[in-house]
Regions:
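C-terminal cap/loop subdomain of S1 sulfatases and analogous C-terminal strand-loop tails that border
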Residues: 151, 191, 198-299, 338, ...
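Short, compositionally stereotyped local motifs that mark structural "simplifiers"
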Residues: 314, 324-328, 335-435
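Catalytic-site neighborhoods of secreted/periplasmic enzymes
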Residues: 1-53, 218
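Hydrophobic beta-strand scaffold residues
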Residues: 1-3, 141, 248
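Short alpha-helical segments and helix-capping/turn motifs at coil-helix boundaries
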Residues: 21-30, 128, 151-153, 232-235
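Polar, surface-exposed loop/tail segments
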Residues: 8, 13-17, 136-139, 178-243, ...
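Active-site-proximal cap/lid insertion segments
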Residues: 32-191, 195-205, 257-258, 262-298, ...
């Protein structure tokens, strides 16, 4: 497969050098070899939280996508041009009860919906390009967002407003078109499902399970799990378990308020308005919940009758059995995944990088075995990448993943590098028999 990413890399660690054939604003399936299978990701940042207070132009807004590699400082052509609203002033907006119903909040929500309309057009662009390339009916298209909404009390929290996301799968030739699927799905299911869709068996080390494809799991999820720890410059620890109807949350730092003063989020007009109204005593009881000085140790919500998760049932005797069930499931899950949340960050860093020195991946070792080059690395978990210097003349092409011995040829020059995620990459090792 030819694998591309355009272009966000918010991985919390440096990616492996073999992660992508290309990851840039130019990355596209159109750069692959003819008839090569492809896997392409496009991240439309227009609906990102920051676009509520600073709606800016991106490379997707250029007349040609992907742009030519000589585009230069493309953003300069948008200097001084304000983003318009793509929705009318009369748009009907339903404000959730945890936010004030006033013009400031309504204007942020209007911009949010405008950004969604704009994003929808970008999705249409990609679908049109697939159609133009006669690939639309040969390609599985998966659409989803990376977390819940961008407004206060949404992103960063484990309420459904922060973790529930839309997802659409389009199969070729209208297969299962219009079907609605209410299964519980977790993001840890994405990797095994992707492999399953490509007829590749998922690995045993995957925490998730395939929900589509050849290796689709026979067992549906009974629960999904969620975790929240560091929020930019602030730290907390919350865990959650949800079944189809009920959500359990465990707050490991109940002495901390839910609201944390994140400098980045407070650029938002709605956030500034919430702070102002809290200080002046203008918030109602539901809106004040987020500003409590302490959190309950446990929370339980019926998401059917209380979709905004505002009525905590953890202390209600009628729900003690459900509370016990989900509480035990939370503990069981944390044990199964060896949850590192309770470990202080300094100790966690020390366990990864002793003395805070980043480990270095061992250099790859090249052996000529018969008519093949066999390459290995002593660093457990490292990926090995290679470039055929005598063939790969395009400088932007990424490192190919080494997965099998390379046939020996006269006049060949091959570069190898090894990299384990979290480590520094190895030095480049070159095999050459060229004159």
């Amino acid at each position: 497969y030819y694998c591309t990413n355009n272009k966000k890399e918010d991985y919390q660690f440096y990616k492996s050098l073999t992660a992508w054939d290309e990851s840039s604003i130019f990355a596209h399936w159109r750069n692959r070899d003819k008839d090569q299978n492809f896997y392409s990701i496009f991240n439309f940042g227009v609906t990102h939280e920051s676009n509520l207070w600073d709606p800016w132009y991106r490379h997707f807004d250029l007349d040609t996508f992907p742009p030519g590699r000589g585009i230069g400082k493309w953003w300069e052509q948008f200097a001084g041009i304000e983003k318009p609203f793509y929705v009318s002033d009369s748009i009907k907006i339903s404000i959730p009860p945890y936010l004030p119903n006033n013009d400031i909040v309504r204007n942020d929500m209007k911009r949010m919906y405008s950004n969604i309309v704009e994003m929808d057009g970008k999705v249409g662009l990609i679908l049109k390009q697939l159609e133009d390339d006669n690939l639309l009916e040969e390609t599985i298209v998966v659409f989803y967002t990376d977390h819940g909404g961008p407004l206060p009390r949404e992103k960063r929290l484990l309420y459904d407003s922060g973790i529930r996301v839309p997802m659409i799968i389009r199969y070729p030739n209208q297969v299962r078109a219009g079907e609605v699927d209410n299964r519980l799905i977790s993001f840890v299911d994405f990797a095994p499902t992707l492999l399953s869709m490509a007829n590749i068996p998922p690995h045993k080390f995957h925490q998730g399970r395939a929900f589509e494809g050849k290796y689709k799991s026979k067992n549906k999820r009974k629960y999904i799990y969620a975790a929240a720890d560091r929020f930019d410059e602030h730290y907390d620890m919350i865990r959650a378990v949800r079944d189809n109807q009920y959500k359990y949350l465990k707050n490991f730092n109940p002495e901390k308020p839910y609201y944390l003063p994140l400098e980045y989020r407070e650029k938002m007009d709605s956030m500034q308005e919430l702070i102002r109204m809290n200080q002046s005593g203008q918030l109602d009881n539901l809106q004040l919940q987020w500003f409590r000085n302490e959190k309950p140790k446990e929370e339980l919500f019926d998401t059917y009758s209380d979709p905004y998760e505002l009525r905590n049932l953890a202390g209600d005797p009628k729900y003690k059995d459900k509370l016990y069930e989900l509480k035990n499931e939370c503990s069981k899950w944390m044990d199964e995944v060896d949850d590192k949340g309770p470990m202080p960050e300094e100790e966690l860093i020390e366990s990864f990088w002793p003395n805070k020195i980043q480990p270095i991946t061992k250099d790859p070792v090249i052996d000529k075995v018969g008519d093949n080059l066999v390459v290995s690395c002593q660093t457990e978990g490292a990926n090995i990448g290679f470039k055929l210097s005598h063939q790969d003349t395009l400088t932007w092409k990424g490192w190919r993943p080494y997965i099998k011995p390379i046939a020996y040829e006269e006049g060949m020059k091959v570069e190898f590098k090894a990299h384990r995620i979290g480590y520094l990459p190895s030095k480049k090792v070159v095999f050459s028999n060229a004159n």
